[in-house]
Amino acid sequence: MKTRNATVEGRFYPSSREKVFDQIQEIERQEKYPVRDLQAEHIYGGVLPHAGHVYSGYQTVPFFQLINRTGKLPGTFVILHPNHTGSGLPLAVDEADLWSNSIGDVPLDMEMAEAMDLPFSRLSHAHEHSAEVIIPYMPSYMKGHAFSIVPVCMMVQDPESARYVAERILHATAEVKKEVMVLASSDFSHFLSPSEGKKKDQLVIDEIMKKNIPGVADAVRKNQVTI
């Protein structure tokens, strides 16, 4: 059995299970982005940041709280994430059977991964943090419900590649007949003032909400948004 060991544990998130849970509880207590007034019957996916938990937790925790409230918990999370290292293939699923970090071992859904029929690459995922940092949040909100992951590392992120990966996910979901949730890992704007970052990000979010794939790409390119 092949295991991918954590690469940013102790830096991007705490190095022990107890400290991870303590940090999540503290973020919940601060309630920067309350979800109590939000309504959602079914959540199919989301965009989550991959910065350290002291930053990203204030967006990620409310998302998982909302999933928890629906009571419709996925069996598999497909995590689409960038490639910061430049290593590996343009598009790749990890070939490990388990991802290990401070919250324990999380299995990969190899049935779903194989049905997606994308290339496998250990190197694409070995030192990449953008999927790893999301996983420690999951156990707190899954109510003991078993879950697995399919990390998909996307070095290329053009509309054609995005459409191709989406088609592969749709095909695989129909084939394996599982409850799947798709998570896209992105920090959106970097190194800008809050007001400027919010303004630029909103241009892209508006196109996402319209489900306008070319519009998303155009907004990113024309406004030089770091997504």
Protein language model regions, located:
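Active-site histidine-anchored catalytic micro-motif
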Residues: 1-227
